[in-house]
């Protein structure tokens, strides 16, 4: 039997190694772990291929009776975080992290918000490679819900759970959003905290995620920090 999962989900070149057909089959395979009528939370980043893979994954899940909660473009931690709070049965994120836009990937989380175990990955691979077909009748097809309000709830929960009081005291922050999934929520979070913030790379176009920016190109944020006024405040890059 072949191998689909690596150390961080299923990844590959979009439309070459990772195709819509495979994404749909992966969605169907999740019926191994979530029963008819149970909830699956899905999020993605800003890659051009993300919408295509999201539609395919959702279709596979719904065709097996699962209800999908589509969070839209959100950072990876938002799916397990919100999913656990809202009692999801399974989570999925479409992203290739720090890779460039031509790559993409799909990773899954269990109901506790943890990465699924290797035994689950092997069951999914067995389902895909053996072309198992267990679609439900039309009257039992799952529903797909678009949830926009949960993004704001995620930011609010982070403020309450993670950000300490007086966090902004004497701090000047430069945030490199890398034209990725945090391009809106990152600035929103620190704006609510009250931090003196400069945000860069906040204009994703589907092709520029991590392009000359982000964790693999620290020169970009270093230049911004150098330009920032740090004489009277501590200056930190994120």
Model feature map: region roles:
Residues 1-59, 63-65, 90, 143-173, ...:
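An N-terminal, well-structured beta->alpha segment
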Residues 10-16, 20, 47, 76, ...:
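Short, electropositive, low-hydrophobicity segments enriched in small/polar residues
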Residues 13, 104-223:
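Gly/Ser/Thr-enriched, mixed-charge loops and adjacent short helices
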Residues 32, 36-103, 188-229:
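N-terminal small/polar loop signature for handling phosphorylated ligands or for N-terminal nucleophile
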Residues 44, 110, 232:
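Pocket-edge structural micro-motifs
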Residues 231-238:
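Positively charged, low-complexity/disordered segments
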